[in-house]
Amino acid sequence: MEEERESLYEEMGCFDPNTPAEVTVESSFSQAEPPPPPPQVLVAGSTSNSNCSVEVEELSEFHLSPQDCPQASSTPLQFHINPPPPPPPPCDQLHNNLIHQMASHQQQHSNWDNGYQDFVNLGPNSATTPDLLSLLHLPRCSLPPNHHPSSMLPTSFSDIMSSSSAAAVMYDPLFHLNFPMQPRDQNQLRNGSCLLGVEDQIQMDANGGMNVLYFEGANNNNGGFENEILEFNNGVTRKGRGSRKSRTSPTERERRVHFNDRFFDLKNLIPNPTKIDRASIVGEAIDYIKELLRTIEEFKMLVEKKRCGRFRSKKRARVGEGGGGEDQEEEEDTVNYKPQSEVDQSCFNKNNNNSLRCSWLKRKSKVTEVDVRIIDDEVTIKLVQKKKINCLLFTTKVLDQLQLDLHHVAGGQIGEHYSFLFNTKICEGSCVYASGIADTLMEVVEKQYMEAVPSNGY
């Protein structure tokens, strides 16, 4: 039996590519295994006859190592199932066969070493390392971490790897090379292969984001910019000069805010603004200023007229009490009287003792328009309103309250509006002015109109 097994090992180059190693070994020795003897160990050179029945499988069985796998994957393995062996030979013959078997086992180990060298030669050439490896962190294993090793190996070797001893056969040919990390190439980094380096800056903004600044030197062709900075801020890239001013300066921003505030204040000063745009606000403000100036002139004329009236009445009283000498003094006082202003000069005329009064005022709202003109003691009023109510009755009541004598009234309908024209005269002893007449009419007519309009709208 030992001679057959010795010939079996001599014929064996490596394992069968279509049969796993463990299954083949078990199938070849299962039939030749004798009954299990007591657990005894045979020592070389021993002459004891009690250890003759040595278990042959313990001597012939050997374990696979990482160096044994390449040879096993290159040469087919042939096994022949022999018939049941005869009874075991004597111990002396078994001892001699064991010595020959150990010699053949050493020869087999040399074959595995040669196979390992062939497997190393199959790996990539370590003398020429590509430049791409210097830019990457090389893993300790050449295979991908989520890749099964059987996809890169031959079919026969994948069958061996599928067994329970596949972990002992795994081997990485690049592990023993231990490539050092090479310094990066600055020229390749300038072309865009990497942005982080010595001249790169990483900053953290106030919101917790990361800003990466990459500086390009003067020798690089940067398209006309002397000093360029690439800024990466939360995924947004901006290219431009380093010292770049904002589009809107603080002075311009403050000026715009100041103008908006002034327009808002001007709108609040207008009594009844019709539109909210800036052009309309400015136009209505100009009209309102002119109106105020006319009102001031009107007040000055009224004050001067009253003062002149008091002066005349006082002089007349003196004439009634005294004689002719007093009349001469009155004429001298009248000649010596001088007006205190230009308005006084226009109102006071020493030749005929007459004063000319002239004023004009216009007020307008969304639903009502009032135009008042005063020439001496005659007052002309024009009133326009939407045709919701008849405002003629309320207007006549207001004229009676202002002590205006109504001489003529004309009216008509123009589209969706009523238009009325009133010709009145100021009664003697009455003190009225254009702004007072317009404001009173606007207040009364607007109140009656809002009461007539339903609450749900027009």
Curated annotation (Swiss-Prot):
Coiled-coil region(s): none
Region feature (Disordered): 1-49, 315-338
Domain of life: Eukaryota
Up-regulation conditions: By UV treatment.
Record-linked Pfam families: HLH
Main location: nucleus
GO biological process: anther wall tapetum development; callose deposition in cell wall; pollen development; regulation of DNA-templated transcription
GO (cellular component) term, any one: nucleus
InterPro entries reported in the protein's UniProt record: bHLH91-like, bHLH_dom, HLH_DNA-bd_sf, MYC1-like_bHLH
Compositionally skewed regions (Acidic residues) per UniProt: 324-334
Compartments where located: Nucleus
All copies of domain bHLH, residue ranges: 243-292
Keywords: DNA-binding, Nucleus, Transcription, Transcription regulation
Gene Ontology terms, MF aspect: DNA binding; DNA-binding transcription factor activity; protein dimerization activity
PANTHER family with a match to the protein in the record: TRANSCRIPTION FACTOR BHLH10, TRANSCRIPTION FACTOR BHLH91
Subunit relationships: Homodimer.
Protein name in UniProt: Transcription factor bHLH10
Species of provenance: Arabidopsis thaliana
Encoding gene per record: BHLH10
